[in-house]
Swiss-Prot record:
InterPro entries assigned to the protein according to its UniProt record, in alphabetical order: Ribosomal_uL16, Ribosomal_uL16_bact-type, Ribosomal_uL16_CS, Ribosomal_uL16_dom, Ribosomal_uL16_sf
A GO CC term attached to the entry: cytosolic large ribosomal subunit
Molecular function, one GO term: tRNA binding
Subunit composition and interactions: Part of the 50S ribosomal subunit.
Family: Belongs to the universal ribosomal protein uL16 family.
Keywords carried by this UniProt record: Ribonucleoprotein, Ribosomal protein, RNA-binding, rRNA-binding, tRNA-binding
SUPFAM superfamilies found in the cross-reference section: Ribosomal protein L16p/L10e
A biological-process GO annotation: translation
Protein name per the record: Large ribosomal subunit protein uL16
Function: Binds 23S rRNA and is also seen to make contacts with the A and possibly P site tRNAs.
Cited PANTHER family: 50S/60S RIBOSOMAL PROTEIN L16 (PTHR12220), LARGE RIBOSOMAL SUBUNIT PROTEIN UL16M (PTHR12220:SF13)
Length: 136
């Protein structure tokens, strides 16, 4: 699972997921999976989608993961009264804004890349679209 090696502080405020994304262009590969909606991806969802793509392309080509889960999400145990401090870190998430490129792929045909990204998109909780690299 993806998570930071070390952080200055273990727990984080909830914050808000507003604004526009950085990393909106396909920069490493030929094809990309771009977020259309707004939301957050857990480390498990990112890994699950990566595995689905890797299996479908049968380890040909190359895949880049353009997102990293760097925000800790805490929760208190079941049946615990309110108060007594913030809960323990349960999992890590990456906040996604519209336009963010999540994955990139290279070295495979467009048809195969499109199928692989469709499988990956089924694992993710946000709407996505298939994009290709634009040549300037």
């Amino acid at each position: 699972m993806l998570q930071p090696k070390r952080m200055k502080f273990r727990k984080m405020f909830k914050g808000r997921n507003r604004g526009l994304a950085n990393g909106t262009e396909v920069s490493f590969g030929e094809f990309g999976l771009k977020a259309v909606g707004r939301g957050r991806l857990t480390a498990r969802q990112i890994e699950s989608a990566r595995r689905a793509m890797t299996r479908h392309i049968k380890r040909q080509g190359q895949i880049w993961i353009r997102v990293f889960p760097d925000k800790p999400i805490t929760s208190k145990p079941l049946e615990v009264r309110m108060g007594k401090g913030k809960g323990n870190v349960e999992y890590w998430v990456c906040q996604i804004q519209p336009g963010k490129v999540l994955y990139e792929m290279n070295g495979v045909s467009e048809e195969l890349a499109r199928e692989a990204f469709t499988l990956a998109a089924a694992k993710l909780p946000i709407k996505t679209t298939f994009v290709t690299k634009t040549v300037m």
